[in-house]
Amino acid sequence: MSWARNIQSRIQQQQQLQKPGGLAPPSGNETPQKQPSSPTLSALSSPITSLTNALRGSGGISQPTTNTTSLTSTSPPSPTISTTTTQVKVGQTSFTTSTNLQAAASGNNLQASIQTTNITVTSPSMASPIGTSTGIQNPNAKPSSLPSPSQSPMQTRNTSAPTNNNNNNNTATTTTPTTTTTTTTTTTTTTTTTTTPSTSTTTTPTTSSSNLGQIQQQPPTLQQQQQQIQQQQQQQPTPIKQTTPYIFPNKIQPKSLTTDMFRGSEFSHVTFVEDLTRKLVNDQMGADGLHFEPAPFNQLFLNTQLQLSQLESNIDRRLDDLAEECNDFSYDYKRKLQDLTGSYQECFQHFKKLEKGVNTIGTKAVHFGDELDSVNQQKVKAQGALSLINYLLELNSVGASSEENGGITKRSDIFTNSDRIHELAHLVKKLSSVSEDIKEISGFKQGKLETESISNSLENDLLNQFERAAERNDYDKMKQCATTLHGFNGGERCRSRYIQKLKMFFDIDSFRKDENLANNITKRLIRGNNIVDTRFEIFYTDILKDVSHEQMVIQNVFVNQTSAMAMLIIRLFEQRVRLFIENVLSLESNNVSMFLQTVHYAFNSTKKLLVDPLQSYGIVGVDLNQLLNSIFYQYQEGYIQKETTYLVSLFQSNVVEECERLQTLDRYSMYLEDGLNPEITQMFVQQTENALTRSYTLSLDNILADNIKTIFFLMLEYLFEKYSMFVLNKYIELPMIPSSSSNVDTKSIQDSISQLFRVVLSINQIVGQIQSMFQVFVLPHIQTSMIVQSQCSDQLYFNISSLENTINTGLENSLTTMIQLIEKTLLPQGRNDYLIDDYDNSVTDTCASVIKLIQSFYDMAKINLQGKNFHIYVEELGLKSQFVFINHFKKFKIGQGIGTLKLMRDLTEYRNLSKQFKSQKVDDAFELLFEISKLHLVNPENFKLVIEGGALTRMSKQDLIIFIKQRSDFKSIWLDTL
């Protein structure tokens, strides 16, 4: 509802009314503000106070729109006339009230009466215009500015407005379809006597000369306002005419207010007022719309205001009680805290004194304990020394008495009882130490000998017990003996004896199993230049299984486990692994290639399948890589000799075979080969890479760079110098045309040139592979030796330069051959080809043949040459061809007209062919060739213009004269104009 949403503005209006000249709230509801001690009650107090002030100021009704006009007279007997118009909105319904008041003051008496009250209700829900107007006009009554006592508190704030007098008692008013007008005329006369200032409602005329007719009024209290509303309801007259029935509520149900309504952050003034007035609004809804009656709302708001005031008083009283309780609690808390602080300080002093006493006693106790422990240690040492001396004296005396009594000796139980052998070992170790200290005393010589004898026999007895326990897998007994021997003399013999007695090192069946596996060559697979041998995987898997089992036993038995594991690993490499590798390699002793591959595979397999897994055991004191190198040292020492011998035999046999085959080729026979034999070149590359890979593994560190250089130089020698150079020279000789031969097969020569191009292409490809090999397989492994690195680089580029020089020679020879073929193709050119009279727009037969030949040369070069080599070659071909054409056309007479057009047709075709070469030099040369045709096309007087304006300026005068003389209409006088 819109009037409920304006509750905040009504609170501000109430604050303004409390200023001087406005309406002050009743003094009975004013309570001093206190600082709340309870957050719950404080939160409730704020909304209740706001609602109380709002209801006091406006009764819950929104700010009305009031138009008032006052007519005052300076003479006391004159009456005051006031017309008040008030507009109120409830939701979408608008209420408009118009009231005519008149009053007259005389002395201490005040006469006031209400003339006419018009109520207009406007609602969008009304379907038809309904209006009533009822009025009672008193012609003797005069307007007054004083309000009627029956008016609501809202209506007391009126200003004067013009009145509308009607002479008829019953007047019907027709309004808009959404407006209902009800005019109620009441006449009320109120007499107020102002005798004392304490009167509840006092109207006193002003004595000011400027405004004597105005009367100052004071707001009534809440009780007086309630009484006025009740009187107004009782005095309400029956309307004279009412077209729409209005039903008033029988009883206003007061809403009980509690503090729970105002709890929480979601409380809203608007929602509260809407809930408060919803029942009244529903009751006033008739069949034809809403009929507003303000009296029930005023009564409801007054009751609510009283309840809110009472609730506010209760909350304030509760706040005061809580504040007092908090103050009392704070006082008690501080008093108890002071008492506890004093008690704590007293207790702290007692504990401090107690701690000091405990520290003093503890220090003394520790001192006494140290002294007692020192005395006890000295006592134990003295007793031990005394016991050792007694045992030593016993051994010394027993030895002497045995000699005197014929070998009859009597010893202590510790020397004779076998169950105390471990205790005896501890005693003998101490006796041996004492014997060393007193060896210079001659009286204890016999005791020292007896101690040594007992020590030897004792160690042998413990070793025998250990071996018997190992045979029956009694790990507890083994551990007891090993621990005793470790404390007796370190236990090295015990660990060594255990390793020697392992089944894998002396059992005949184990030896035969390893030997049979090494001789089983069916498990070896050869894949190209690589081998896959599963024998090593089977063998090393079995070893790792045995090592894992023995490690478990060693951890459970021996104290010094690292030493025992080191002995086990060393024995494995020195005996079992070495024997297996020797058996495998002995089968390949007659085949150098397989021997080298097997050695390399065995080395890598041993490292990968055995050394690397054993690294995970973390055995201290054993260098596994050194053990690996010790096994393969005998093969590494003579590796490079075997490698070079194998490579030389392989390279030599292939090169000799290929060279012998090429020697049988005829000069002009057809060739099916495409350059170098790819099988041979790839064999060189693959075998060299394999050899370099083997050298990384099988070469000793100090000679690795030299071995790589040896292998690389060997490959360069056979691949470049002995094979590639030989093949290149062989194919360079083929395209040469003998001068004595008058009939040469052009197709055969073209094929030989094509073969040369393919050889050049093959050489370029193999050179690229060798350069990649150098970067990947050679250079990274020789960087530690700058001398070897420099030697390898120089040798590589020397061989490449030699090949390039030879290739350049071959390409120059091929160009010469091509030009010779072009000249040979131009020979059939007829002398009258350019003296014809009929023009058919076709090239000559010779021109077509030459173009076809040059195009074939260009295609061969494009397929087989690459990069700058191709561009330089075709550019040279184009320039040489243009030179041949220049000399060729110097020999022919050119007819003017049709003959010149025929010449231009041939020259245009030559020029178009030259565009493929994509060379500016070639384009300029053929442009010059085409310009020659203009000398035959223009008139003689234009020779100078043609020569100076085109490419002919680059041609010598002698050549120009030659071409001019070839005109069919040549006259010598033309030469004077040049």
From Swiss-Prot:
UniProt-listed InterPro entries: Sec10-like, Sec10_HB, Sec10_N
Pfam families: Sec10_HB (PF07393), Sec10_N (PF20667)
Segments for region (Disordered): 1-87, 122-246
Compositional bias per record (Low complexity), positions renumbered to this chain: 36-52, 62-86, 143-245
GO terms, biological process: exocytosis; Golgi to plasma membrane transport; protein transport
Coiled-coil intervals, chain numbering: 303-325
Protein transport keyword on record: yes
Gene Ontology CC entries for this record: exocyst
Biased composition (Polar residues): 1-11, 122-142
Subunit record text: The exocyst complex is composed of sec3/exoc1, sec5/exoc2, sec6/exoc3, sec8/exoc4, sec10/exoc5, sec15/exoc6, exo70/exoc7 and exo84/exoc8.
Its biological purpose: Component of the exocyst complex involved in the docking of exocytic vesicles with fusion sites on the plasma membrane.
Similarity comment text for this entry: Belongs to the SEC10 family.
The protein's name in its UniProt record: Exocyst complex component 5
Gene expressing this chain: exoc5
